[in-house]
Amino acid sequence: MDKQNPAPGVYLDTSWACYVESSAANNSSLSPLERSPAHYRHHSTHDREDTTAFKFGRLVHCGVLEPDTLARRYVVRPDFTELVTLKDGTKPANPRATKQYRELVAEFNSQNAGREILDPAEWEEMEAVCAAVQREAGDLFKSGAAEVVVVWDDAETGMRCKARLDWVDWERKRIVDLKTTRDAAEFEQSLGRYRYDRQAAFYLDGLRACGYEVEEFWFCCVESSAPYGVRAAPCCEQTIKHGRARYREALQLLAECRKKNKWPGYSSPTHWRLPTWARNGLYLETDGVEKVLERRTAQ
């Protein structure tokens, strides 16, 4: 796969570093574009903040989708506090503040350069999450391929697009996307809040554009804390249609911005107006001040 300009097709065993090198349009970049082209431009030239949630999500993805690569990509830092002693053989009150502790950590980090270092608690949490996924939704990941990269040219705009699919089950013709979440009971809200409908449609259409039959897009969401609740289901057709309309509008806007090389920010309203939810409970406009005061006095 050419890092800078990959040809349309489906790629397996493509590293994340290789994937992000391409400037092809991808789903995650469409979220800042929906705010404004200026936000898209900034997003495309600046690295995304690597939050604790993102890091743990990557760890869980690796544990569920590519468990054979865990040892190569991650290592657990031992509890060096047990090894730290003073010259008289006693234990210091604060082992982490000692020179010996810092030297042990520095040596360990040097020996494991290139791997992400985890605390024992992080590893145990990942194992618990992965066990929950396997117990409740393991059938989704029994056959297929992980981290499938898809590259295609959008027929309408001509733009090169790309996607990295968590899991593709070729036999059952489905894409599965794994999400970690704080509350799986509210995942329907996340579908709209984080534009997951757009992601589902974008990925389905991308794989189809490469000549593959695919019928369903599943989300499997797992809570990142005990008891690690799991929910999994395919998206309904209406959700896919809504997501398709959303990404089509975004791609058309992106194509126009690239063509003109103009990246405008927000447009301003003619006047600031309260949203409907903020006006609820206010009766001044219809009842007048006297009736409002009378109502509140009676309460």
Predicted regions span which residues?
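Mg2+/Mn2+-dependent nuclease catalytic core
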Residues: 145-245
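Metal-dependent nuclease catalytic cores that hydrolyze phosphodiester bonds in DNA/RNA
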Residues: 1-162, 293-294
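Metal-dependent nuclease catalytic regions and adjoining charged, substrate-binding loops involved
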Residues: 3, 202-299
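A residue-identity detector for tryptophan
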Residues: 16, 123, 152, 167-170, ...
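Short, charge-rich amphipathic segments
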Residues: 124-147, 175-188, 267-274, 278-281, ...
